[in-house]
Amino acid sequence: MPATMVLTAPSLLSSSALIVLAYLIGSIPFAVVVSKLMGLQDPRSYGSGNPGATNVLRTGNKTAAALTLLGDAAKGWFALWLARALVPELSWGAYALVALAVFLGHLYPLFLRFKGGKGVATALGVLMAIEPWLAVATIATWLIVAVFSRYSSLAALVAAFFAPVYYVFGSGAAWHARLEVGLAIAVISALLFYRHRANIARLLKGTESRIGKKK
């Protein structure tokens, strides 16, 4: 069997450690941390109750919302960057699991009793680490839908739908797609839809709040 196919105990341990570390990084609740540092209400106590940038924006504090967005995106990127920095020979399968772990950490954070955000910014950070141009295409999709609809949730859903599509069809032209990574992106997209199920119901009813509107 080729050496690259052998999973040694040290490699399994390092991969497992990176996955756990990624989950813990994803668990950092930037919406709560930023709000507390800036003297704002806990984002879980108003609006949608979601500890994310869109809900923080409902306070009217754009700086706090921007810092939350950057923090949530940065942790998605950082977890994958750190994994490669610590273990350069990390397999693509383990890399994909690290991507899922940091995303799940945001959705179900240890530090907030497993009640986290919806994961849009963290997902974008993950995409930025995987392929910067993939992230740019996904962000552009979000911006176009958000500008014309003023619905953050609708923009997130459309962007989530197209992210794995972009990854597959961009392969060969802009990057080399990996099956394991593609599956991770697809799972992240599916989880984004699941986390937005209440938003989907409100969009269908016409009761969803628009960007910047206080509830």
UniProtKB/Swiss-Prot annotation:
It is an enzyme of class 2 (transferase). InterPro entries: G3P_acylTferase_PlsY. Pathway: Lipid metabolism; phospholipid metabolism. The keyword Transferase applies. The keyword tRNA processing does not apply. GO terms for molecular function: acyl-phosphate glycerol-3-phosphate acyltransferase activity. It is found in: Cell inner membrane. Pfam families: G3P_acyltransf (PF02660). It catalyses: an acyl phosphate + sn-glycerol 3-phosphate = a 1-acyl-sn-glycero-3-phosphate + phosphate. Its EC number is 2.3.1.275. One of its GO terms (biological process) is phospholipid biosynthetic process. Keywords: Cell inner membrane, Cell membrane, Lipid biosynthesis, Lipid metabolism, Membrane, Phospholipid biosynthesis, Phospholipid metabolism, Transferase, Transmembrane, Transmembrane helix. One of its GO terms (cellular component) is plasma membrane. Its main location: membrane. It is a multi-pass membrane protein. The chain crosses the membrane at residues 14-34, 63-83, 92-112, 128-148, 154-174. Catalyzes the transfer of an acyl group from acyl-phosphate (acyl-PO(4)) to glycerol-3-phosphate (G3P) to form lysophosphatidic acid (LPA). This enzyme utilizes acyl-phosphate as fatty acyl donor, but not acyl-CoA or acyl-ACP. Belongs to the PlsY family. Probably interacts with PlsX. This is Glycerol-3-phosphate acyltransferase. It comes from Bordetella pertussis (strain Tohama I / ATCC BAA-589 / NCTC 13251). The gene is plsY.
